[in-house]
Swiss-Prot record:
It catalyses: (6S)-5,6,7,8-tetrahydrofolate + NADP(+) = 7,8-dihydrofolate + NADPH + H(+). Its EC number is 1.5.1.3. Belongs to the dihydrofolate reductase family. Keywords: Antibiotic resistance, Methotrexate resistance, NADP, One-carbon metabolism, Oxidoreductase, Plasmid, Trimethoprim resistance. This is Dihydrofolate reductase type 8. It comes from Escherichia coli. Pathway: Cofactor biosynthesis; tetrahydrofolate biosynthesis; 5,6,7,8-tetrahydrofolate from 7,8-dihydrofolate: step 1/1. Key enzyme in folate metabolism. Catalyzes an essential reaction for de novo glycine and purine synthesis, and for DNA precursor synthesis. It comes from the Bacteria. Coiled coil: none annotated. The lineage of its organism: Bacteria, Pseudomonadati, Pseudomonadota, Gammaproteobacteria, Enterobacterales. Gene3D superfamilies: Dihydrofolate Reductase, subunit A.
Length: 169
């Protein structure tokens, strides 16, 4: 069975986006870390997150969860992204398309909520400066059943790894 990890950047107030983009300037090393962790993996996201990507995520299989009607689950677009309407189809295609044992949930807020019970690890880039946006997650709720398993401090941000408590005992 494939393991789901969430990867996201957020501020102390839970802000993760504004106008379908990150509300902060690029953080040194953050995109490289995202690429390193997700390269060769399946990434699961919502339609708005997919549409906000500035470029195709090369070397990764994208599964896009959407509320828009689909003729069949698993329809692919010109970039090869797989479109699905529900969690079970997302997980089925993640399992089928995966070349490893981990898939990453990359957003947005609604997708994190829908897959929360299945996520075993969270890779959080904590942005130290406060930003306002239009998309938020409840960080306290998100990590309440997790235990910090790693931390890497930087000037403008800190990387945290959280592992589901039942898996660390």
């Amino acid at each position: 069975m494939i393991e789901l990890h969430a990867i996201l950047a957020a501020t102390a107030n839970g802000c993760i986006g504004k106008d379908n983009a990150l509300p902060w300037p690029p953080l040194k090393g953050d995109l490289a870390r995202f690429k390193k962790l997700t390269m060769g993996k399946v990434v699961i996201m919502g339609r708005k997150t997919y549409e906000s990507l500035p470029v195709k995520l090369e070397g990764r299989t994208c599964i896009v969860m959407t509320r828009q009607a689909l003729e069949l689950p698993g329809v692919r677009d010109a970039n090869g992204a797989i479109f699905v309407n529900n969690v079970s189809d997302a997980m089925r295609f993640a399992q089928e398309e995966s070349v490893g044992d981990v898939a990453y949930v990359i957003g947005g807020a609604e997708i994190f909520k829908r897959l929360a019970l299945m996520i075993t690890q969270i890779e959080l880039t904590f942005v130290k400066r406060l930003y306002e946006g239009d998309t938020y997650v409840d960080l306290a709720e998100m990590v309440k059943d997790y235990e910090q398993n790693g931390m890497e401090e930087h000037d403008l941000h800190t990387y945290f790894t959280y592992r589901k408590k039942e898996l660390t005992e």
